[in-house]
Amino acid sequence: MEINAQKLNEANATVEAKIAKQDVEKKEEKIAKELAKTMNIPGFRKGKVPPAVIKKRYGDKLAQDAEAELVREALDQALEELGIEKEAMLGEPRFAKYEKGEEVIEMVLEIGVRPNIDITGYEEVIPEYEEPQVSDEEVEKRIEELADAMAQFKEIEEDRPAKEGDLVVIDFKGTLEDGSEIEGGSAQNFELRLGSGQFIPGFEEQVEGMKKGETKTIEVTFPEDYPNKELAGKKANFEVTLHTIKEKEKINIDDELAKKMLQKEDATLDELKEEVRKQLKSEKLSKLYNEELKPKLVEALVEKFEFDLPKNIVDQEIDVQLNNKAAQMSEEEIKELRENKEKLEELRKEIEPEAQKSVKATFIVDALAKAEGINVADQEVVQTIYYEALQMGRNPQEILKAYEEQGLLPAIKMAMIEDRLLTHLLSKKNEKQEENA
């Protein structure tokens, strides 16, 4: 077997090999002898099956196994010659060529290798930033919102008209201009928060001003973009009877509120304000990190470090991004791409720079995470998936199984590592800024 291994750069290598027919036959003979020791074939004692019988019965399979084993041997020899550890090889080697002739098999394997990245000086590109401040007005507004959310609706005793913000209990029945009833357009003892925008424009505004026990016909027009096309743009009448008006009880902003919110018997309003200030600051900082600083940091890291990228990993990322684009295409566009290889190749070329950037960022994040001791346990990945599934009202086990089947768990884990790493780097920068201030 002739082997010619070559490193194209730090992240890519090729293996050219010629496997002679005799090599394949020898390997078939060896495999047949090993199988003969263990196989049970009627008419022969166990371990006494002649290799010729094995070859006759399993000829095609033996040939495939022999070729596969010789390919592995060629790969192992090439890796040893090039000084590449098996653990450093990324993904499966790809056949750029595999031609079977009568006397020889000619093949070319492409190998992707994990690049060595010198991350010296990464601290220099972590962006500086001013820590967000929280005003007293923002704190007061948030406490008022929290108090409003805690407040209960109570039926009013005074005889006054309904107004925006009230919770009213109504019966309604809707009909079109021709007198036909609107399907799903009727209800009894329906609770409606006036000003919520829950009903079509004009409905809630006309309920405002009604009193308890009053019945009124409300005229409205369904919007042109109303989801139900049969109703879009049509005029309708709703006969509405108002039964009850409720308003939110007023909650005093004081120590008693603080005790309820902080679940502490000795809590004070000042403590509550301090906790709310911290929460608001955390929210602002999170928004600053996610919307501005993290993208800026990734961009800076990608620009700072230069290294070779394994072609097979870049191609995989191109496939991912291509599939994402295809998900937004029409059937006609997808069909055209399938039938027009030149156009498909053009699209891949168009995607390639962004794919390279994504792969490069992943390698940098991986190297920095190791340097900074940042990791995410598999159990944390599962917990995150469970939490997000519950938030969406989905079955966590089904979501987890789907992600496993689609091979998405490593990508989710890497995204979590990236998020944790970038937050860690920015926090360290912030601490140094405070020390130097």
UniProtKB/Swiss-Prot annotation:
It catalyses: [protein]-peptidylproline (omega=180) = [protein]-peptidylproline (omega=0). Gene3D superfamilies: 3.10.50.40, Trigger factor ribosome-binding domain, Trigger factor, C-terminal domain. The keyword Isomerase applies. Keywords: Cell cycle, Cell division, Chaperone, Cytoplasm, Isomerase, Rotamase. Coiled coil: none annotated. Its EC number is 5.2.1.8. Pfam families: FKBP_C, Trigger_C, Trigger_N. It is found in: Cytoplasm. It is an enzyme of class 5 (isomerase). InterPro entries: PPIase_dom_sf (IPR046357), PPIase_FKBP_dom (IPR001179), Trig_fac (IPR005215), Trigger_fac_C (IPR008880), Trigger_fac_C_sf (IPR037041), Trigger_fac_ribosome-bd_bac (IPR008881), Trigger_fac_ribosome-bd_sf (IPR036611), Trigger_fact/SurA_dom_sf (IPR027304). Belongs to the FKBP-type PPIase family. Tig subfamily. HAMAP family: Trigger_factor_Tig. Consists of 3 domains; the N-terminus binds the ribosome, the middle domain has PPIase activity, while the C-terminus has intrinsic chaperone activity on its own. Involved in protein export. Acts as a chaperone by maintaining the newly synthesized protein in an open conformation. Functions as a peptidyl-prolyl cis-trans isomerase. This is Trigger factor. It comes from Nitratiruptor sp. (strain SB155-2). The gene is tig.
